[in-house]
Amino acid sequence: MQMKKLLPMLIGLSLAAFSTMSQAENLLQVYQQARLSNPELRRSAADRDAAFEKINEARSPLLPQLGLGADYTYSNGFRDQNGLDSNSTSASLQLTQTLFDMSKWRALTLQEKSAGIQDVTFQTDQQTLILNTATAYFNVLSAIDALSYTQAQKQAIYRQLDQTTQRFNVGLVAITDVQNARSQYDTVLADEVTARNNLDNAVEQLRQVTGNYYPELASLNVDRFQTDKPQPVNALLKEAESRNLSLLQARLSQDLAREQIRLAQDGHLPTLDLTASSSVSDTSYSGSRTSGAQGSAYDDSNIGQNKVGLSFSLPLYQGGLVNSQVKQAQYNFVGASEQLETAHRSVVQTVRSSYNNVNASISSINAYKQSVVSAQSSLDATEAGYSVGTRTIVDVLDATTTLYNAKQQLSSARYNYLINQLRIKSALGTLNEQDLLALNGALGKPVATTPEAVAPSTPEQDARVQNSAPDSNGDGNGNSNGNGLLNAALPR
C-alpha cells in the first residue's frame, strides 16, 4: 500500500527533475554552476582560508604558553651494598608569557598582509572565472551561428546547383557553370566540417570551465541587443588605478616586502619573557640500609617549589646573519617595486586595449549590419542578372558567399563586443555577478548545442550531388530524370 502511495510521488519528482534539466541554461545559471564546481576557484578559496587561519598560528607565540610535565623513575641498587630501591615521581606546571619580542609581532603583521594578498588573489580568480565562463558561453553561441550560416549557405548553393543543372540539361548554360557550382558546394561541405568541429570544441571548452554539458543554451536575442559607448579612457584609467586587482595585489606585495625588511632588522632587538612554574617531587626508598645511612641521604622526601622570573636575551653578534637577512629583504623590496611598475604598465595597456576593442566592436557591428544589407541586395541583383544572362554563375556564387560571410562576421562582432565589455570591467576590477545578470537581458530563446541539432546532416543530398554530374558532351544524360538535383523544392 505504501509503495502505491510513493510511486506517484517518485514519478512526479522524476518528471520535475527532467523538466529542470531540459530547460536551456542562461549565462548566469551557467556561471553559478561553474562557481560551485570549478576546481581552480575552490583551490583558491582553500588557499585563502588557509592563509587567514595561519594568522592564528602567527598570533599564538604572543599568547601565554602553558605546559604540564610529569616524570616517574624507579631505581634498583642490586650491586649497592645497601641494596636500596627508590621510586621517584615529579610533576611541574610551566607558564611562559612573551613581554617583548618584536620579531613575533612583526611575523603576525606579515601573515595578516599575506592573508590580504591571498584574498585579493581569490577575488582575481573569481573575476577570471566570470570572464572565462562568459567567453566560453559566447564562443559556443558564436560557433552555433557559424554552423547555422554555413548550413544555410550550403542549402543556398545547393539550390543554385540544382537550377544550374536544370539549365544545363536544356542547353541554356555550359557545363562549366555546373562544375563551378559543384566546386563551391564542395568547398562549403569542407567549411561545414570545420564549423561542426569548432562547435564541438567550444562545447567542450565550456564543459571544462563548468564541469557540465549543456544540450541547450539561451541564445542571443538580436532584437534586444544594444551597444553602449565606454567611458572616456582617462576616466577608466583613473578608476583602474584604485580598483584593479592585479595592481592592488602588486601594491600589497610591495608593502609585504617592506615589512620583511623591518622583520630582518628586528633581529638586533632584545627579547623579554616572563616565566613561572610550580613543581612537586616525591622520592621513597626501600630495601636494607646501613646504620650510617639511616636518617641521612636515604630518607624519603616530598618537595614542592614555585618559581617566578624574567628571561632577557640580547643578541650581540651572530656572524653577520642579521645584516645579510636585511640586505636580502631590501633586494626583495626592489624586486617587488619593479613588479608593481610592471603591473601598472600592464593595467594601462589592458585598459586602453579593452577600450579600443569595445569601440572597434561597436564600429564593426555597424559596418557589418550595412554589409549584410548590401550583400543581400547584391545577391538579389546578381541572381536577377543571371536569370537574364547578364551575370554568370560565378558571380552568383561569389555574392552568396559574400552574404553569408557578412552574416557570420556580424554575429562574431556582436559576441566580441559582449566579451570585450566584460574584459574592460575586469581590467577596472569591477567585474562581478551583476554584470552577467545584465547580460542575461540580451539573451532569448533556447538553442541546441549539438552539431546535428543545429545543422542536421544531409548525406542523401551530398551523395546526390556527387553522383549526378552531367557528362561533358552536354547531352543531359548526367541526370536521370532531367528535373535537376532536387526531388522537392527547398525553402529559400
Language-model region placement:
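N-terminal signal peptide c-region/cleavage motif recognized by signal peptidases
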Residues: A17-S19
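Acidic, low-complexity, intrinsically disordered peripheral segments
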Residues: Q409-R492
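Periplasmic alpha-helical coiled-coil/stalk elements that build and connect Gram-negative outer-membrane
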Residues: K5, T128-R243, N357, S361, ...
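Transmembrane beta-strands of outer-membrane beta-barrel pores
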Residues: Y72-N76, L99, S278-S284, L314-L316, ...
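Outer-membrane beta-barrel translocator domains and adjoining extracellular loop/strand segments
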Residues: F78-L84, S219-N221, S284-A293, S324, ...
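Amphipathic alpha-helical coiled-coil segments
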Residues: R43-A58, D125, L129-Y149, R159, ...
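A glycine-/polar-enriched beta->alpha junction
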Residues: Q32-R42, D49-P64, S92-L110, V120-Q127, ...
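Short sequence motifs at beta-strands and strand-loop junctions characteristic
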Residues: D85-N87, D300-G304, N405
